[in-house]
Amino acid sequence: MALLIGDGLWSGVIFTALFLLLVDLMHRRKFWRARYPPGPMPLPGLGNLLQVDFEHMPYSLYKFRQRYGDVFSLQMAWKPVVVINGLKAVREVLVNCGEDTADRPPVPIFNHVGFGHNSQGVAFARYGPQWREQRRFCVSTMRDFGVGKKSLEQWVTEEAGHLCDAFTQEAGHPFNPTTLLNKSVCNVISSLIYAHRFDYEDPFFNSLLKMLQESFGEDTGFIAEVLNAVPVLLRIPGLPGKAFPKLTAFMDSLYKMLIEHKTTWDPAQPPRGLTDAFLAEVEKAKGRPESSFNDENLRMVVADMFIAGMVTTSTTLSWALLLMILHPDVQSRVQQEIDDVIGQVRRPEMADQARMPYTNAVIHEVQRFGDIAPVNIPHMTSHDVEVQGFLIPKGTTLIPNLSSVLKDETVWEKPLHFHPEHFLDAQGRFVKHEAFMPFSAGRRACLGEPLARMELFLFFTCLLQRFSFSVPAGQPRPSDQGIFALPVTPTPYELCAVVR
């Protein structure tokens, strides 16, 4: 009897294994085309999951590119992926084929924090009516509240003043500037979303930022990729909360803020910020179940604005200060330009930027060298597309490798070095390269780019107007190698700030 049970068990195992192999074979059969991009041989069921180093993704993609070319394929379990490298191929995908490559692949790991059919936010929303509705709303609302205008510029300048005051308290001894940079940039976003700025010592504010900081990497590592590729695993009770504890806690805190803010909303009064404007649209959308204006989507939109608007800018500023202490000659030249154009008394203004080509070049080179979003947010083809002679089927996930563009050896003189002259012509005038795309390109380019540019210029010039930065005495020279997550952050470092 035991023998029969054993034989039956093994028969079941063998049958299941053969069935899964057959499913895997049939799933991949449609990609067996002569013009499908080449790539490493996938393992049955797993694909290339074990061949990609998710902790060092840019380098892993670089190695594959060296072997398979600018357009190559990967298989993440049963999910087909094509990686696009180099300026020519990336522009072809994002711009020339933009209408057919603007979709997003499903991201099952976000379902446990509120992502759903009518609550897709903006960044990860499927390309269609809901995305268009929310992007249009965010762009117009940001414009209404001063993006590109003097009113928001004053907010940023005032916050830069608070940041400089906080730096003054740290002057004279080594400190890591990252936390203070996070607080200042987050306050700009909070003012835009909630019409409220936090005191730097506010316990809730510090807890919120700590959770967000600790969530970096939770949605970009090997575990996240496996769960996205095999979403049935997310049905295991308690697994999502254990796999993404900090992201879950951050989203819960955002929801708490929204509930508290909603109790103070008066629809009869002009909107105080983006949240009030969204709530007004929710009222208008009642009776339209297909609308993306609902309470669930408000949380997703606010999360997108918070994460994209705060994390990217503060991380870039952290790179900027690191590179200033590593390149004191560049820092001195920026300060000389600040002294010549602005002086030491008045605060910097956006109008100054046109007369400060070197400072502008340095900020752009910080963005290029820092390369904080090397693999971009994945896209997905909504139709068959042809790229560089390869045929990519509908439903394929695309990874535009922005790092391969920002460090393209055919474009940049010194792609792996910090070199502000990349953005200056022979006469010292600022020039912008086609290969400069830290905000991506095409239909899904970052909608917060105008705000980010304003923040980077005003915060950076305010800091270098007030302080000189250096490597602390007795400490080794910090590394300029980043730590891969979303975003890529500098290796932790300390600096000394001396009031000028």
From Swiss-Prot:
It is an enzyme of class 1 (oxidoreductase). It is a peripheral membrane protein. GO terms for biological process: arachidonate metabolic process; xenobiotic metabolic process. Its cofactor is heme. The keyword Oxidoreductase applies. It is found in: Endoplasmic reticulum membrane; Microsome membrane. Heme binds at C446. The keyword Transmembrane does not apply. GO terms for molecular function: heme binding; iron ion binding; oxidoreductase activity, acting on paired donors, with incorporation or reduction of molecular oxygen, reduced flavin or flavoprotein as one donor, and incorporation of one atom of oxygen. SUPFAM superfamilies: Cytochrome P450 (SSF48264). Keywords: Endoplasmic reticulum, Heme, Iron, Membrane, Metal-binding, Microsome, Monooxygenase, Oxidoreductase. Has bufuralol 1'-hydroxylase and debrisoquine 4-hydroxylase activities. Belongs to the cytochrome P450 family. This is Cytochrome P450 2D27. It comes from Mesocricetus auratus.
